[in-house]
Amino acid sequence: MFSLQKKALQHIYMTPENASQLTKDLLQHLGLYWNGPIIKMDTVVHLHNKIFSNRSVLKYALAKQANITIIKTLVLWVEPEYALAQALKHNRKDVLECIFSYHLTTPKYHHIMHLTSSQELFEFFHLFICKSKNYNARMECLLYAATLYNFPNILEKNREYIIRYSIGNSLFAIACKERHIHLIAWFVTAGVLDTYDDSMLFNTAFKLGDYSLLEVACDLPIIYPDYLIISMMQTAIQKNYFRFFKKLLTHFNIYRQIIITDAAYYNRRKILLLLLKQNIFNNFAILCALSAAIKGHASKKTLNLLISQLDSQMTVVDSVYYSIIKYNNIDCIPLLMQIKTFRMETLVSIAVHGNNINIIAACKAFLPKDTLYHLVLKMAIVSRNYKLFKLYTEKENPMYIFTTIKAIISNLVNYTVVQAVAIEYLRKFHQERQLPIVPLLMVLAEHNYITKFKKTCYAANMSDQKVKRALIKCLFIASQKNYCQIFKYCFGSLLKVLSKHERVKFFNSVVFAKKLASYYDHQNMIHLIDSLIERFRYLIKD
């Protein structure tokens, strides 16, 4: 007669014909519902060809809540960690006690604590695996584990302890890192954080790129200051987190110029579209955004988007011009030409002042040659930038440059200091290129630069007929504009070089000059001419 033990062993190989996997029948044949002893085996053979590991048998036995006596035997057939993990999964405190009784010196198994869903079992398990004898150390270990594996009830239960020992912030950091949304909300609202910063949750959300964490921060019953939300919006723009930005914008409804400016600078077209659809920003704000887009070398699509939102009559602010020049953004110039109030002249003037050769060269495609040279040379003179002046004059036709500078000098009548600089540049250019003296004499006489006029006359060939005719013309200019010194010098110079026959014509010219002075009512000039005629009349007598 077989003993029960032998009978059980025999039944290991006696399984139902239709059994294809580990079933209740097999467990019964194995004796898992029998209170007697079971002999340890490495594997269990089913249907003579299917082999089940001891782990599979233990896992199934726990799932079917098999006899504890049998399970106590089976846990010895597997590794302690696997047995503990299965006991936690199935919330079997009795099995845990059994395992811990077998393994009094267990290593740390914190990494499998999360396998249980039972708060009681979690705490019980931690009690065994935490080796510290210090109560505070064990409590902190438990709370850190509860935070790590998302057990809010344990934290709520020990709320006073968290406050007393000021460990709320470190636990909160773990919750944020692990993205336990409900736990994060609990930390913020439970009053356990000793130094809570409003930006902490937002910063963590951006750092982790966690949208759900941002939603928690937005939905918390906290009134955030505007500057914080604006700062977070700027961060969203920099990181190009469109969902984050949209959530902040729609939830807090905060609009500031710095926001659209940053979006333009970082070329965030999608964010710009969202902002511009609100119809909140005025033309000035959009112009500032355009300036920022130029600064950041934004795409053509972004620039066109901003330009299309502008009022066509809106005056372009200086910051737009300065941004083009400072950041050398040539590509945006054709796009800005769409704005009616955009002035190439202003751009060139500022470019010359900033000595930006690239921008000046780029403007050649959009301005007539005369206009460009007039602007460049004028600004070079005004800013006393002789290097730029020389750059734009050395390869050009000398007389063309002379004529251009002459026109510039005429435009600077009310700016005597700058006009004097222009005259000096003209004389220097005239000398370097060895141009005819006559045009220079006329310019100096017309603007009453007597000292430079005298020096030029001194250097001229006074016997040259062209020079003589030029001096006579200077007489007329002087009488017309009441330049007594110029008139007197021309008169004296001509008397020295004219023949007797020429003097007669010359005196006729002087009489005509007197008529001009009378027409303009220049009494000083009239008296001067009368005195000169009376004094030198003898020169035309036979």
From Swiss-Prot:
InterPro entries: MGF_505 (IPR004858). Keywords: Early protein. Induction: Expressed in the early phase of the viral replicative cycle. Pfam families: DUF249. It comes from the Viruses. Plays a role in virus cell tropism, and may be required for efficient virus replication in macrophages. Belongs to the asfivirus MGF 505 family. This is Protein MGF 505-11L. It comes from African swine fever virus (isolate Warthog/Namibia/Wart80/1980) (ASFV).
